[in-house]
Amino acid sequence: MKPSSLIGALIAWLFVAAAAPAAAATITVHDIAGRDVTLEAPVKRILLGEGRQLVALALLHPHPASLLVAWSADMRRQDERLYDLYRAKFPLLDRVPFISRGSPDTFSVEQALAAAPDVAILSGGYGPSRRSDDVVHKLEAAGIPVVFIDFVEDPLTNTVPSMRILGRLLGEEARAEQFIAFYQSHMDRITTRLAAAKPAPPNVLMHAHAGHMECCNSPGRVTIGAFIDIAGGHNIAVDVLKQPAGRPSLDETMARGQLSLEYVMARDPDVYVGTGGLHLQALGGLVLGPGVDPATSREDLAKVVSKPGLDGLRAVRTGRVHGIWHLFNNVPFNFLAVEVMAKWFHPDLFKDVDPDESLRELNSRFLPVPLVGTFWISLDPKPAERGR
């Protein structure tokens, strides 16, 4: 072969090799349930046991819908506006079958098996959890690897490892590390300053799904309640809530439940934080989320704390009444909730922290579907507030 022909053949081979997809490699991930799971990656066919984890996939992969073969309907049920925004951005979602109506008891193992995923990513919440032994056994018996992630039950511990797991599964380790560095820098700014200043923590009432039920459903140090301590507050619920039945894997301090109005009035908290979302729109509760106007959220919040018992609390009398998007309890960018709460709890210490700017950077650098709406609100519009 002539040298010129040899060079031409070599160049052609290099082009073909560069265009060829990367071969799958066998990897082992250590999931948040403490299990070592071996599978081929990057995965091409994903089952999401909880639909809201699409947001986490979208942080890392440019076309997350192209990877989905089955998912749960919880995003559509809990935040239809967010669901519609993702459908508009990723039209392939309309072709992906739901295998659950958005609750663990409606999860169809048969439909999951029929979807033939490379991996089932489960996370509890509105889908099968690490306590769903029967579901896990059936999936694994059929040769489907099961990997657990978590942004809900213990977000402060599990957010970073969960994103690292997803990065490995998707072959997007570099992107995952970029997000983790961004996330950690925002969390460290809060925790480092609190550790140095050691301010007295205000007593905080977190009223979950505010306005939906009688006062007051409240988390302990689990789910969205986990952010109170790290933001420099004291959650009055952790002093009385006991371990719920059927949750042996959780510590007592991780409990959640109902606080009596009498207890709340006796504790007379310094700060009131209600959680809300679009799921409360038809229920007369606090509405926050994508596309929501801040005036609407502020009006809802005022109605909630005007109810007998709440209206006389110190937090209401002194204007320390706030609302936050409940879905922060199930997304990787929960650092926004921590920044906002830290500013509410210690406004002088964190007067230079700008959650609005943090959200703008998150939108520009990482989110393919920008968060635009009202995700936190105050009766006094001067503290941290989002409503663009």
Regions found by a protein language model. Give the residues of each.
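Positively charged n-region of N-terminal signal peptides that target proteins for export
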Residues: 1-5
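N-terminal ligand-binding lobe of clamshell/alpha-beta domains
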Residues: 23-388
